[in-house]
Amino acid sequence: MRNVMIVVEYDGTNYHGWQYQKNAVTVQEVLQKAIKKVTGEEVNLIGASRTDTGVHALYQVANFKTNTKIPAEKLPYALNSVLPDDIVVVQAKDVEDSFHARYSAKRKRYKYIILNRKFQMPTMRNYCWHISYPLNIEEMKKAASYLIGTHDFSAFKASGSSKTSTIRTVYDLTIEKNEDFINIEIEANGFLYNMVRIIVGTLSYVGLGKIKEDEVYDILKSKDRTKAGITAPPQGLYLIKIIY
């Protein structure tokens, strides 16, 4: 039996996240059905990151066990011929049997896009968070620096998380302005439930002057979710890299 790894890009707008749900359409379910059409096999597709409803992926990694004889390099063509236009397999390769898309991952990187201008941009409404008041980028950058390193991120975790440990290491957190857009990228060894979106929401409060930049350190140390900012909406979030 082979262990096949695939790299997937998707527009999360029309999906209830990655993970299979009984009464909703998810990315995992659509991909598993496509694999069955192509190989004739029911597979258990393991994703590196269980993205939420409306969240996008420019680099999602998944793996599945299969007996198919289709060469790995032909699989993307076969799968894309039966997949909808908003899910694309860009790479497939055979990997060792022990490879697990989720548990073998060492780091994950996300990008969050904010549109910071007076009016919404209709063509981007499903792909960014519109904030109409000007954000102070320099203050946001100062606040972000407190979050780099190994910390207890309980203050940036939504309720409903099944993870027991709340300690995570953030290796990189950058904020760049590109005309009307603000791009926030964060890389860590793992993320708690809604952690990226709560960090973005908190940094937006700093940018708006609702929270002082040095208060972010106090919020982090408090381990109290109620002290942090709002949870940023899902449509601005992109999974952009999995590092093994």
UniProtKB/Swiss-Prot annotation:
It catalyses: uridine(38/39/40) in tRNA = pseudouridine(38/39/40) in tRNA. GO terms for molecular function: RNA binding; tRNA pseudouridine(38-40) synthase activity. Its EC number is 5.4.99.12. Signal peptide: none annotated. The keyword Isomerase applies. Pfam families: PseudoU_synth_1. GO terms for biological process: tRNA pseudouridine synthesis. Gene3D superfamilies: Pseudouridine synthase I, catalytic domain, C-terminal subdomain, Pseudouridine synthase I, catalytic domain, N-terminal subdomain. Belongs to the tRNA pseudouridine synthase TruA family. Formation of pseudouridine at positions 38, 39 and 40 in the anticodon stem and loop of transfer RNAs. Homodimer. This is tRNA pseudouridine synthase A. It comes from Thermoanaerobacter pseudethanolicus (strain ATCC 33223 / 39E).
